[in-house]
């Protein structure tokens, strides 16, 4: 059984203080860092995970500054966890490929050293395929607890995916505040998400 936590990144600077972002940064528009408060509540989220008995072997993160910073703060609570940058956890890119600090020419679309069929910009349907592909692969590659730090749009897509599997569940994907956490257990023997384990925590 693999326990999975998919977490939206913490509070981003450009939405909270756009003028400061414009004056002091203003280069990679898609790659805002966190606010000071964002760092604090990300670490708090890590402590809450630990207090619940969760102990991830791997913490996977999208390659954006805000997701990597969130993952790094969570990792301070789990010093034995391994932090892994996973390209395909990237934000939805419908109009143009995002240029970010780590990849100023655009984010790669490889998985496990191999090129995939995905590219940017992308349609909504290809984005859904990408989300389902990468989360499936990360679960396949693990037998212990994992954390996935990513973006609100990706979280919404995967919540809708679970809703399509279990229509009787009442899952709300319309709004995903900072650090929204989707939790579930995956039974690898039966190759399925355990319905009773699905939970969304909107608190931060």
From Swiss-Prot:
Q: What InterPro entries does the database record attribute to this sequence?
A: His_Pase_superF_clade-1, His_PPase_superfam, Phosphatase_SH3-domain
- Identify the residue position(s) of the site Transition state stabilizer: 151
**Gene3D superfamilies from the UniProt entry:** Phosphoglycerate mutase-like (3.40.50.1240)
Question: One Pfam family name from the record?
Answer: His_Phos_1
- Which residues of this protein are catalytic? 9, 86
- State the family named in the UniProt similarity comment for this chain: Belongs to the phosphoglycerate mutase family.
Q: What is this protein called?
A: Uncharacterized phosphoglycerate mutase family protein R708
Which species does this protein come from? Acanthamoeba polyphaga mimivirus
Q: What is the lineage of its organism?
A: Viruses, Varidnaviria, Bamfordvirae, Nucleocytoviricota, Megaviricetes
């Amino acid at each position: 059984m693999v326990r999975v936590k998919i977490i939206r990144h913490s509070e981003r600077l450009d939405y909270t203080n756009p003028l400061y972002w414009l004056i002091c940064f203003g280069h990679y528009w898609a790659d805002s860092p966190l606010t000071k408060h964002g760092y604090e509540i990300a670490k708090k989220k890590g402590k809450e995970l630990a207090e619940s008995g969760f102990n991830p072997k791997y913490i996977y993160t999208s390659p954006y500054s805000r997701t990597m910073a969130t993952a790094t703060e969570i990792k301070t609570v789990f010093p034995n966890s391994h932090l892994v940058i996973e390209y395909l956890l990237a934000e939805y890119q419908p109009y143009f490929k995002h240029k970010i600090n780590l990849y100023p020419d655009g984010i790669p679309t490889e998985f496990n050293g191999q090129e995939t069929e995905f590219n940017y910009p992308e349609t909504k349907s290809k984005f859904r395929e990408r989300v389902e592909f990468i989360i499936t692969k990360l679960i396949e590659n693990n037998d212990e607890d994992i954390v996935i730090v990513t973006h609100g749009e990706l979280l919404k897509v995967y919540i809708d995916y679970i809703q399509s599997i279990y229509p009787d569940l009442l899952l709300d994907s319309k709004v995903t505040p900072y650090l929204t956490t989707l939790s579930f257990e995956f039974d690898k023997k039966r190759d399925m998400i355990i319905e009773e384990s699905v939970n969304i925590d909107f608190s931060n």
